Swiss-Prot record:
InterPro entries: Amyloid_glyco (IPR008155), Amyloid_glyco_Abeta (IPR013803), Amyloid_glyco_Abeta_sf (IPR037071). Functions as a cell surface receptor and performs physiological functions on the surface of neurons relevant to neurite growth, neuronal adhesion and axonogenesis. Interaction between APP molecules on neighboring cells promotes synaptogenesis. Involved in cell mobility and transcription regulation through protein-protein interactions. Can promote transcription activation through binding to APBB1-KAT5 and inhibit Notch signaling through interaction with Numb. Couples to apoptosis-inducing pathways such as those mediated by G(o) and JIP. Inhibits G(o)-alpha ATPase activity. One of its GO terms (cellular component) is plasma membrane. PANTHER family: ALZHEIMER'S DISEASE BETA-AMYLOID RELATED (PTHR23103), AMYLOID-BETA PRECURSOR PROTEIN (PTHR23103:SF7). It is a single-pass type I membrane protein. Keywords: Amyloid, Cell membrane, Cell projection, Coated pit, Copper, Cytoplasm, Cytoplasmic vesicle, Endosome, Membrane, Metal-binding, Nucleus, Secreted, Transmembrane, Transmembrane helix, Zinc. One of its GO terms (biological process) is central nervous system development. Proteolytically processed under normal cellular conditions. Cleavage either by alpha-secretase, beta-secretase or theta-secretase leads to generation and extracellular release of soluble APP peptides, S-APP-alpha and S-APP-beta, and the retention of corresponding membrane-anchored C-terminal fragments, C80, C83 and C99. Subsequent processing of C80 and C83 by gamma-secretase yields P3 peptides. This is the major secretory pathway and is non-amyloidogenic. This is Amyloid-beta precursor protein. Binds, via its C-terminus, to the PID domain of several cytoplasmic proteins, including APBB family members, the APBA family, MAPK8IP1, SHC1 and NUMB and DAB1. Binding to DAB1 inhibits its serine phosphorylation. Interacts (via NPXY motif) with DAB2 (via PID domain); the interaction is impaired by tyrosine phosphorylation of the NPXY motif. Also interacts with GPCR-like protein BPP, APPBP1, IB1, KNS2 (via its TPR domains), APPBP2 (via BaSS) and DDB1. In vitro, it binds MAPT via the MT-binding domains. Associates with microtubules in the presence of ATP and in a kinesin-dependent manner.
């Protein structure tokens, strides 16, 4: 019974840590719109490189 409780507690605390990371990430992105623009630009660059590579083949 104690072992089961311990396992459940670990699972819950693991979930809490994961949830806090998600919340922190969301707040970080919300306060730093430059990061979102940077990610979008990076995505466009990567997509362009892939398209050029496919056209070259």
């Amino acid at each position: 019974s104690e072992v089961k409780m311990d396992a459940e507690f670990r699972h819950d605390s693991g979930y809490e840590v994961h949830h806090q990371k998600l919340v922190f990430f969301a707040e970080d992105v919300g306060s730093n719109k430059g990061a979102i623009i940077g990610l979008m630009v990076g995505g466009v660059v990567i997509a362009t490189v892939i398209v050029i590579t496919l056209v070259m083949l």
